[in-house]
Structure formats: structure tokens, C-alpha cells
Amino acid sequence: MKPPAACAGDVVDAASPASTVNHLRWDLSAQQIRALTTQLIEQTKCVYDRVGAQNFEDVSYESTLKALADVEVTYTVQRNILDFPQHVSPCKDIRAASTEADKKLSEFDVEMSMRQDVYQRVVWLQEKTPKNSLKPEAARYLERLIKLGRRNGLHLPQDTQEKIKNIKKRLSLLCIDFNKNLNEDTTFLPFTREELGGLPEDFLSSLEKAEDGKLKVTLKYPHYFPLLKKCHVPETRRLLEEAFNCRCKEENCAILKELVSLRAQKSSLLGFHTHADYVLEMNMAKTSQTVATFLDELAQKLKPLGEQERAVILELKEAECAKRGLPFDGRIHAWDMRYYMNQVEETRYRVDQNLLKEYFPMQVVTRGLLAIYQELLGLTFTLEEGAAAWHEDVRLYSVRDAASGEEIGKFYLDLYPREGKYGHAACFGLQPGCLRQDGSRQLAVAAMVANFTKPTPDAPSLLQHDEVETYFHEFGHVMHQLCSQAEFAMFSGTHVERDFVEAPSQMLENWVWEKEPLMRMSQHYRTGSEAPQDLLEKLIKSRQANAGLFNLRQIVLAKVDQVLHTQTDADPAEEYARLCQEILGVPATPGTNMPATFGHLAGGYDAQYYGYLWSEVYSMDMFHTRFKQEGVLSPKVGMDYRTSILRPGGSEDASAMLKQFLGRDPKQDAFLLSKGLQVEGSEAPAC
């Protein structure tokens, strides 16, 4: 990559007019990452300097708004090339260089967001531009820049701005370190085969051996969740649950306390009562009081269900203790929850998770999932053989509109765990689908990163049903990234209100609870036979199993997040323990500190974890109102969905998109019914 001449608005190899170009590259050395980071900062700053130095009479749409939009497109792509490898590179040196690049670029982002000279010229542009002379999305972009400027305090005295800038820089570094600590955690616990009683042979044979011959169980998802669900040795579950919720306890506890304190300081300087109120101003909920009411009302409705489910679990535990000759203490512990919730599915609903996963080999699930998405959204996916990526396991697909044949994007699938890799499942937007400087459309590129069970020499990767659900969910985010047709990078893909962003992908989770889609993505890994009808019917009926406890736990996490961002002196571990007891009725394990492992708190979901439940109101309404009524695999409804919900990206308000797709304002009825709750009369409007 050669640097462009002088201070051109296009940064590093961005002048190609071909809209089907993937500008991403994954072959950079640590040294190149460092050099290109410096270069990117210099070239981008050059554009901001030019905009900020203009005489006010020279300020125009082209010289100001378009210049900022163009540099945002190219900066975003180059930044992702430099900071994405920290999550996925197999090489520790490159991960470290990428993390450092992210820190430098985050500091730079803060500097550019605090450019009062640029802000003044944007405000001037709005004042001198006749109303309705800009296209709607350009006007929205102009308004958003001014709103963001005010939210950064650019209308406040210089000394206040300086304080805000320093806090923002520190916050960026702390967030990066918080999640890096979790990603780089290599803790494992050694157990004998007897201590792992109840786990299937394919799981045991996939474990590495320690020097003393014991089996290594890591704290990564493909080890942690199966063990907590299936291991019938309570002490093993206790040790693992305790270790899992003590990850990075010391270092992340200190980071979290500083994060919460600094966020409160910054919000106060900006005139907000709490950090939650600052964050929520940009969301559908608007205020922390609205969120508190939503969570409290839902918790009240779910509590009776939770009590019934806890009683069932205690019965199961008493029977299990008698069967295995173990003392029964009459209590449910944190390490009991997943084990007995799994037993509820297996005993009350007769769902055998070990048998079920034999029908979900990765290749079959992937083939079925991709076919369903193509059919539903009018798309065609093609595997790009031998495409360059960051690891040999990664696959790259090209996506075309089925009707026109036009390429609209590409996506990477990186599905298996590796040391140092991002530990959860997520979609990363890597190249925004938007207009480039020359007016051509830039190809959207996204990556789905997950940690599903790896194949072994004896068996392919077999997915638990909840992993199939996760796959559908995250791939829904990928489709949002690729199907959006915004003009500005700021509104591309999933750049919607944070308490709506989960709705499009949550809605698509419904397909893994419907018989026809399940038939299409299941097949026995050895015999090739289709999944028995009764097995799938039992699975579908089990959807509401444990709905009370599962959703009460989501409320606990959402409330911890809200408490930390409304009461600055709250102790995270104490608040989590209090809420677990009050809402879930199951105590947190003494000595653990779950919030120190809660990546969302430092991953852009601060004061916004409630959004998972809030957006489910919309996802359930969309599914039941349109797809369930008109056909779960209806290409017509699928295309309406692509057009009304995915295509705008963030270029319209979520409420307007929902009204367009539903034909009315959203309601909570479908959401409450999906939780096993009764809807009394006519339910109040959504949220």
C-alpha cells in the first residue's frame, strides 16, 4: 500500500472505483501494523485539519460534510485491517501489535471527535444550508454530527472539553484492556475421567491431556457450557463455575471500578444526571427510568414462573442426590443451574441433548442455514475457494442479489476456538457498505467469529441446539451488515439504535424452533438419516422450558449494568450477588466476581444490556405478525423484511422501520406469550 499524494481525502489504497473490491488484507506483520497505524493517523488528521482551517465563507457541502463522510469510509476500512487481528490472529505478536494499534487509534478517535474547529464549521454549514436542500440521509448525517459534537461537549468551555477528552482517552484504553484480559486468559482445570462423569465420549476425547494424565478443561465456551450442563459430579461443576466467574478477577475488577467512575464524571461534565441517561438519550428507551420500569415490570411478571421452575429443580436435585448417594442441602447453587435446567429439558420434555447434537454436524447446519437465508432474503452465496484470510479454518463467501446478480457483499466464517481468539460469538463489520468518494457503492464485508466445538479425528463438529441458535443469531447480524444500502458509513449495517440492534438477528433465531427449517439443517452425522419427527417436536415444545429463570437472569445482568451506571459507588460483585438473590433466587458463588468477566460492560453495551430484552419485544412482534401469519419461509415476507428492516441500516429511525414492516406501532403481546406469560386484555404499546 502506497500512501496517496499530499493530503487526499482517500486514505491508503482507497481510490479504486470498482465497487466489488475487498480492500481488506490479513497478511500484515506486527511492524507493518505499527507503521500503517501512524500513516493512517497522519492522513486522516490531514483531512480534519483542512476542514477545520476553512474560512467560514468557504464552508460548503463538498468541502465539509462530504469530505468528512469520505474520510470516514476509508478510515473505517483501514482501521479494521489494523485492529481486527487482535481478536482473531493466531500469532501473539500480531495480536499485541493490533491491540496497540487499537489503543493509538482510539486515542486518535477521541482527538478527532473533540475538534471544535471542525464542529464550528459543521454548525455553520447547517445554519447556512436552506431547509430541505439536502437529501434526507445527508441531512440526517449533518444533524448527527452536530448531536455528537454536543455529546462530546464541544459547546462547553475549553477547560471542560479538555477534561472530557482526557477521560474519553482513558476509557478507550481501559475497555481494550478489559476484553484483552478475558481473550488472553488460558486458565484450565485438570480433572480425571471419573470427575467428568456424565460427559459424552466425543467431548472427553477432544480434551488435551495434562502432564499427570488428567484431562484439561479450559474456561472457553465449548468446554464450560457442556460440562455445566452434563457433568453429574457437583464438585467438578462447582470448581469450574467458580473459576469461570473469577477470570481476570483482580485486574478487571480494578478496571471496572475506574470505568464506572470515569463514565459518571464525563456524563456529569456534559450535564447528565447519570451515565445511563447520557447513553440512553440516543436509544429508543431515552431514559434510565424507562429502562428501570421495563425491567421491573417484566421481573414481576416472571417471578411466579421462576418460583415454579426453582421448585421443579429442587425436586430434581433431591432425586439426583438420593440416586447418587450425595447429601441434599435443600438449596440451588450457581453451579446447579445449568445442570438441572438441562435435566428439565431431558426429563420433562424428553429432549436428549446428546442425541440431538448427533443430527447437527457443522457442515449440514451450515449448508441448511445458508440455504434458508438465501431463499428468505433473495440472495446467492458462493464460497471463494482459496481466499486469503487470517487462519486456515476461515472461509470467505461472496453474496449476490439473486434477482439482479449484483454482488452486494462478502462474509468470513471463523467458527472454531483458538488460543488468544475472541471468546464469544459475534459479528464484526469490516468494510461498510456505503457510497465511496467517487459515488460508486463500496462492497460490504463482515466476519462472523464464533467458538463452536471443533471436529476431532473420530467425529465432525457436532453442535448443541443452543449453538445452532447462536449461529442463526450472529449470521442475522452478518445479513444486516451486507443488506443495508445506506449512503453514509455512519449509517451502514448495524449502526442503528443500540436497543434495536439485536432485534433483526433475534427474530431470525425463531427459525431454529420451527420444524421445516430444522429439517433442512439436520442430518445424522454417521448414518445420514433425517432427525426423527418426535425428537424435533419435543425440542420445539421445550422452547419455554426454564423461560422464567433464563429471562430473570437476563434481567439480573441488565440491572447490574444499570446500577453500575446510575449509582457510581455501587460495588459490582455485591450488586450482582444482591440481584441474583432478589430476582433469580439463586445466590452468586461466594468469592466470585461475575461483573469482572462481563465483556459487555467494556464492549459498547454500557448501560445497554437491557437492549437484548427490549429488542426482543420487536423481534417477536415482527416474527409473529408477519412470518408466522404469512409463512415462516415466505420469500415475499423475507424480501419485505430485507427492504424495510435491513436495507435502511441506520438511515431511518427504528420506530419508522418497524411501523413500515408491521403496518402499525409495535406491541408487547407476542413477546410476553413467548415467555410463557398471559396477555391480559389489550397489552400496552411496546416499551
Curated annotation (Swiss-Prot):
Enzyme class label: hydrolase
Residues modified as Phosphotyrosine: 278
Catalytic activity, as annotated: Preferential cleavage of bonds with hydrophobic residues at P1, P2 and P3' and a small residue at P1' in substrates of 5 to 15 residues
Record-linked Pfam families: Peptidase_M3
Enzyme Commission number(s) from the entry: 3.4.24.15
Subunit structure and binding partners: Monomer.
Keyword Nucleotide-binding: no
Gene Ontology biological process terms in this record: intracellular signal transduction; peptide metabolic process; proteolysis
GO molecular function annotations of the record: metal ion binding; metalloendopeptidase activity
CDD domains the UniProt entry points to: M3A_TOP
Listed cofactors: Zn(2+)
Job of this protein: Involved in the metabolism of neuropeptides under 20 amino acid residues long. Involved in cytoplasmic peptide degradation. Able to degrade the amyloid-beta precursor protein and generate amyloidogenic fragments. Also acts as a regulator of cannabinoid signaling pathway by mediating degradation of hemopressin, an antagonist peptide of the cannabinoid receptor CNR1.
Binding residues annotated for Zn(2+), in chain numbering: 473, 477, 480
GN (gene name): Thop1
Protein family per UniProt: Belongs to the peptidase M3 family.
Catalytic residues (positions): 474
Top-level division of the source organism's lineage: Eukaryota
Sequence positions bearing Phosphoserine: 16, 172
The protein's name in its UniProt record: Thimet oligopeptidase
